[in-house]
Amino acid sequence: MKKLLLILFGLIIINPAQLIAGDKEDIIKQLLANNAYAKKNNQTADEYSANGALEFWSSGGLMQKIEPAGRPDKYDYMKIDFKHIEVIVLVPKKAAVAMYYSEGSMKPEGAPAVSHYLTRVTQGLVKEGGTWKIRASHWSPVSGGSGTTQTTLN
């Protein structure tokens, strides 16, 4: 048994990338699937942690506490694409950070349309029940683009 543990430990040291194999790809696939859902259904997917999340939004304003049910975002239309997604795995199979650009146009229900939405996104993700969930987000407008006008959930 001791020999087996030493061999396994040695393999991990020699090839630590095996530990994170698939996490990056799974996260990118899930982010794109959640975005496709939002575009098709004009509302966001179930993507938040059971512990909720903290967020800074592209509109500026103060930090927002998001409940586990997520943000109740609904849109008259939503034509946003995620681009240049990069993932940093912090703890294999448990925690990661995703960074990407969110670009397009949208009209949230009850709010003005945003014709050139262009933001940088950083999200802290945790794996819950086999699915990567949002635990923290920071959205900041890129020069020449704009964020939303929403500053609170209420």
Can you name each region flagged by the protein language model?
Residues 48-64, 71-77, 109:
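A short gly/proline-enriched turn/hairpin at secondary-structure junctions
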Residues 4-15:
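Sec-dependent N-terminal signal peptides
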Residues 118-147:
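Short beta-strand edge/turn micro-motifs at domain boundaries
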Residues 110-115, 144-150:
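A short acidic/glycine-rich loop-to-helix N-cap element
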Residues 15-51, 148-154:
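Short, low-complexity N-terminal intrinsically disordered segments enriched in polar/charged residues
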